[in-house]
């Protein structure tokens, strides 16, 4: 099992990033690949969780140990796999998640992709009181330069599809942001907030 990887970030796609370490390129699935845009060709530390299946070995990556801890707690719940847990982590609203679990807010939890009523109830049963709320880390990232709006929006929609959101949901999101100019990362963050509001 791997705890973390240190290496050069060489590639970003809508579904994963590639980190080169010791001459090997590791394909790492992350919640929001575009949050790493400023790190391309730089040294990064990515916290890892490895999933070994009959047909594949998968690496899931996180910005921090806290983010990884949330992911690990989520996949301990029956009915939540790594992809669904990653979609929940992508929303980047730990306070909202913890409040929903601790207050049995099933409706809020069901807004996440692939979370039905039974799974939401199971989340409450399994995770209530298990999260220690950490203060949100101040971002040390410099502000990103805005790029071509439509291309960035396309990349954001592709990343949201990879997280399990439906094309019909994203059609409204695309229409809302059409004509604006943001980075893919910002589109994803804004879209996730909108999707969670319902």
UniProtKB/Swiss-Prot annotation:
Signal peptide location: none
GO biological process: DNA recombination; DNA repair
Cell location: Cytoplasm
Region span, Domain II: 64-142
Region of interest: Domain III: 148-198
Location (main, coarse): cytoplasm
Matching InterPro entries: DNA_helicase_Holl-junc_RuvA_I, Hlx-hairpin-Hlx_DNA-bd_motif, NA-bd_OB-fold, RuvA, RuvA_2-like, RuvA_C, RuvA_C_sf
CDD domains attached to this UniProt entry: UBA_RuvA_C (cd14332)
Membrane-spanning ranges: none
Record's function text: The RuvA-RuvB-RuvC complex processes Holliday junction (HJ) DNA during genetic recombination and DNA repair, while the RuvA-RuvB complex plays an important role in the rescue of blocked DNA replication forks via replication fork reversal (RFR). RuvA specifically binds to HJ cruciform DNA, conferring on it an open structure. The RuvB hexamer acts as an ATP-dependent pump, pulling dsDNA into and through the RuvAB complex. HJ branch migration allows RuvC to scan DNA until it finds its consensus sequence, where it cleaves and resolves the cruciform DNA.
Subunit structure: Homotetramer. Forms an RuvA(8)-RuvB(12)-Holliday junction (HJ) complex. HJ DNA is sandwiched between 2 RuvA tetramers; dsDNA enters through RuvA and exits via RuvB. An RuvB hexamer assembles on each DNA strand where it exits the tetramer. Each RuvB hexamer is contacted by two RuvA subunits (via domain III) on 2 adjacent RuvB subunits; this complex drives branch migration. In the full resolvosome a probable DNA-RuvA(4)-RuvB(12)-RuvC(2) complex forms which resolves the HJ.
UniProt free text on domains: Has three domains with a flexible linker between the domains II and III and assumes an 'L' shape. Domain III is highly mobile and contacts RuvB.
Protein name in UniProt: Holliday junction branch migration complex subunit RuvA
Organism from which the protein derives: Streptococcus equi subsp. equi (strain 4047)
Organism lineage string: Bacteria, Bacillati, Bacillota, Bacilli, Lactobacillales
